[in-house]
Curated annotation (Swiss-Prot):
It catalyses: shikimate + ATP = 3-phosphoshikimate + ADP + H(+). The lineage of its organism: Bacteria, Bacillati, Actinomycetota, Actinomycetes, Mycobacteriales. This is Shikimate kinase. PANTHER family: SHIKIMATE KINASE, SHIKIMATE KINASE 1, CHLOROPLASTIC. Binds 1 Mg(2+) ion per subunit. The gene is aroK.
Amino acid sequence: MARPIVVLVGPPGAGKSTIGRRLARALNADLVDSDELIEKATGKACGEVFSELGEPAFRELEAHHVAEALNHDGVVSLGGGAILTESTRELLREHDVVWIDVSVAEGVRRTAGERTRPVLAADDPVEHYRNLLETRRPLYEEVSTFRVRTNSRSPQQVVAEILHHLEDD
């Protein structure tokens, strides 16, 4: 069975997709994004699927596609809330998981104005993002084997740090 080189987790706006693409290129590997698997299967954007199904049904669908993604080699990037599902966290225990971390201020800045992320829709985006991070932080800590912060750092710097981590393993 195939096994990912590394799995990327982190909140919305942390840079998982950007880092994932660059990391896959640096490793000469494929990138599998669980959000893209959902979009391909449903023919709709993840945010639209989330809005239509509601969070519990969306998380169930997401868990199915996360399990599928974890059967690929290469780099795997998971949606920001994938770690909310216990079965996903159990599967991640068997993998090298890098937590792409970001501050509240930077995460809000990066996701400002994005209507494609209903999980971030709020009257007070800063407070909402802070609450989201407070809820998810212990879960990211639980599943990750390595943490990299993206604040004020270029994607190249973040990728270099992850590559160094992978070489040390």
